[in-house]
């Protein structure tokens, strides 16, 4: 199969850094944080435009810190503990429990009756290892994206 993209690690890091503000903005909106793209640019550049609530600033800071953590630890192995650390970075400063750990209660998704399993009902180590052992890197990336 011909690959549409054949980017090096350095290419991917460059692309991620170029798209970081857009990624933070879109993640924030997905989570219901009411910010504009311009607000996100200002926040990322440490400009307080007075339009973002303190609560939303903490949420944006968590997203920014998580991206910085990922970019600064790019050579670390992807493990369950690494994923938990990213969760910690995203949620620190917010009222999220347990912070940096798997949830212990059920959750719902607006607009659907589907409920994900509790983490205690899953074998995340095995699931992650199965995905990471896929020899097709593009398939691995797609499956990992959907799994996380």
Segments from the language model and where they lie:
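FIC/Doc superfamily catalytic core
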Residues: 1-148
